[in-house]
Each structure stands twice: as C-alpha cells, then as structure tokens.
Amino acid sequence: MKKLSLALVGAGGIGTTVLREIREGRLEGKVEPVLVCDRHPEKLKRIERWFPDCDTSTDLDDAMSAEADVLLEAASVEAAASLLPDALKRFDVIVMSVGALVLEEGLLSRCREVAEVTGHRLHVPSGAVGGLDVLRALRGRVREVTLTTIKPPKALNKDVSERTVLYEGSVRDAVRKFPKNINVAAAVSLAVGDPSLVTVRIVCDPEVSVNTHVIEVESSAGTYRFELRNEALPDNPKTSAVAAYSAVALIERMTEGIRVGT
C-alpha cells in the first residue's frame, strides 16, 4: 500500500509524538512526513535529523503548498483558524485545536461548504476524552451534557491552595477563556451537535496530579457517565498524552481497510 504523505503544523508535544510513531512505532512504514512547520526553528532541528528528506519551515503559509495527502494541525487555535477552511481545498485535514471551530464564528459552516465541494474531509480526533462515539450515536436524543474538567494548577497556570471552580457555563465562553486547555469541550459539543446542550465546568485542584474529564449525559436512550484520568505529556503539562495518541490512531485508521467504532 502507498504510504500516506503527511504535512504537520506544530512540532510540540502532539506533533513530536506523531513523528516518533512514524519513525519507530505504529505508523512506521505507513506514513511519510513531507513537511513540518513550526515557528520555533530549534524544534525543527530534531525533525531534520530524524527525517532528512522531510522539508521544514517556520512559515505557516508553506503548509498550504505541501504535496501531501493529509495536513495535521497540532499548533494552536490561531493556526487552525488561519489554515481553515482553505486547507480543505488541498488536503484532508486533522485539527487538534478543535476550539477554533467553536470560537471562530462561522468557521465550522465554511469548512462544511468547502468539504462538500472538494470531497476532502475535516477530521476531529477524540483527543483527551472517550465517549464521543456514544454522543454522536445519541445525536438528537440528548437532553443535557455536563463536562467537568479537573486539572492541577500547573496545567492551568493558576496559583490556588484549594479546589476551585474557575468556570461554569457555555462551551464557547469556556474555549474563549481557556483556549489552550479546553479543546475537549469543543469536541464534545461537536459530537452532540448542539453546543447549547453542553455545560462546561473547569476546576483547578492542587490535590490532583493528572488531568481528569468527567462527561455526564442525560438522553432519551439512557444515562451515561464517562470518567477519564489522563497523564500529561512529559514535556507539556497542558496536554494529555492520550490526545497525542488519538492523533496517531486517527492517522493509522486512514491507512487501514477496516475501521472500528462509529
């Protein structure tokens, strides 16, 4: 089978995890990186050692001209908003900074329009949570969803001495106030299909050492509760390791003939 060619925007924790899996893991022999963009030149030096034939750039615009099958955005909400929807004219796109689709007014609908014309797809990985397949299956039957995210102070850049509720409210305001920490809320709302059904609660707790997400669902088909306690990436306390692995899994799925899950 022909290798999947990949353009990557963002060589941080998630991007580096994906590249490591291409080099010596579950994506080895299946995926070929053709371009890596990052605004920090020092991060690109390691990539150049790993993949001598892969182009690197500090200019985001170069990603749009890459000869790739898939573009993976793993940089920031700002980068995602800059790339979309135009990137869908050239590639399938995997977006990790899902908050951009909620925060930027009209961006999601513009992405849909471009995807319908070009046939390219916008992929939203599960990220740091599970249960998105259930939420998608229940679309139209959900009465309410509550997402509680609990993180240690270092993950939220807060200095608190006791468990503190930092925010409770809508998905859009949660993403606006915590853009680097709350892509989970955006992914949940996209799976549900109606952000107004989702209430987000963000808690800072000095007694915890891992990122925890609790999703509680009331629907006509049943009541559901998902709790995930995620270790952070060693070099990025704001990102759950499983979020990076979800990107790896989605890319791997693109190379396989059998797909498991909704």
From Swiss-Prot:
Its EC number is 1.4.1.21. It catalyses: L-aspartate + NADP(+) + H2O = oxaloacetate + NH4(+) + NADPH + H(+); L-aspartate + NAD(+) + H2O = oxaloacetate + NH4(+) + NADH + H(+). NAD(+) binds at A128, N183. Pathway: Cofactor biosynthesis; NAD(+) biosynthesis; iminoaspartate from L-aspartate (dehydrogenase route): step 1/1. One of its GO terms (molecular function) is aspartate dehydrogenase activity. Signal peptide: none annotated. Keywords: NAD, NADP, Oxidoreductase, Pyridine nucleotide biosynthesis. GO terms for biological process: NAD biosynthetic process. It is an enzyme of class 1 (oxidoreductase). It holds the Pfam family Asp_DH_C. The active site is at H213. It comes from the Archaea. The iminoaspartate product is unstable in aqueous solution and can decompose to oxaloacetate and ammonia. Belongs to the L-aspartate dehydrogenase family. Specifically catalyzes the NAD or NADP-dependent dehydrogenation of L-aspartate to iminoaspartate. HAMAP family: NadX. This is L-aspartate dehydrogenase. It comes from Methanopyrus kandleri (strain AV19 / DSM 6324 / JCM 9639 / NBRC 100938).
